Amino acid sequence: MRGIKALSIAFGIIVIVISCNNPFSTKYNVKGEIVAFPKSEAVNNKNSLEWWYLTGALRDSLNNRYGVEYVFFHFHTKDHVSRVMVNVAITDENDSVFYYDYLIKKRKNYLGGPLAPEDFNSYINENEKIEVELGSKLPINFQLQDYSWKGDQGYYTITAKMKKNSAGFNLTTTPTKPVVLHGNSGYVNYGGITTAGYYSYPRLKTKGTITLNDKEIPVEGIMWYDRQWNCGEITKKDITWDWTAISLDNQSDLMLYRIQSKKNDGYLFGGTYIDSSGNTMKLNHDDIKLIANNNWKSPDTKKSYPLNWEIEIPKLEIKLTMSPIMPNQELEIKSFFGSVIYWEGLCDVKGEMNGKPVKGESYLEMTNK
């Protein structure tokens, strides 16, 4: 592959399409060599771009299915301002409705702790706040208007209330597999673009309620958690990618990506396989075959996204097909730095592994810059 160093890591990110020059400052990116828990769960001060990400499939007592996406972004820009953005979405399969909302706010620059006790005490009394708790544990503890996320290391409580829809949720998660440190240490080199921190908790057991049209619905299922930082440089306009996290009914999980620079021909593939016990296998470019087709054109943005995906991993004897449960799961976010457009939604997966039939669910991210 010309012009891009091989990425022998798992690559999974929330997709940001920016219609202007890269606004992020990388001056304060973390110069780490290994992830340390629980500290790595907390905010990094003035980071170029970092996020905390949950997606998954939940069901109610009637087996109706719902997709949930929840992301907190924190970023520091070249105008020396730290900001926070939250993205939230719910896919209602039964009624074929996709709900989403977002919020962007300026934040104080001392987000990355630990804070002095006097700063901490005054800060948490604000009406709108993001906070980092003091002490030996630095759990996630964010609150931004009607959105909150608390906990650490797979034990999370998340709440959301959308402004423009009578929709939201109140969910708690519990880990069922060990943390996955991508790049072995939890730091990865994205093709020479940046060295980013990256780890995941796959298959989080999830329970709680979803609210649709002011009605609370008890649900349960599994979700996938991603944590990344130092990612400002990967939002450049000439870089595109697609990503998926797949959970199969044999209790194994896959994370796969394809990345492309507009300056180069073809795609670069990578990912991670996680077996039923939580053991991981790094998947390199030559290990993966991904073919996408049958484009769907958004009636809102006029962008096109492939709806049918064929996945092959010969070394694991895996052959899968993946398709969304409904076409329109696109988000369009208007921010101070331009238009943020991406497709992210719940998909069905079926195929075979080691000659045996498997099926499952996935979340898929797609860009089309």
What is each PLM-predicted segment?
Residues S8-V17:
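Bacterial N-terminal signal peptides
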Residues G3, C20-K369:
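Targeting-peptide/extracellular-domain and disordered-appendage signature
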Residues M1-S8:
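Bacterial N-terminal signal peptides that target proteins for export
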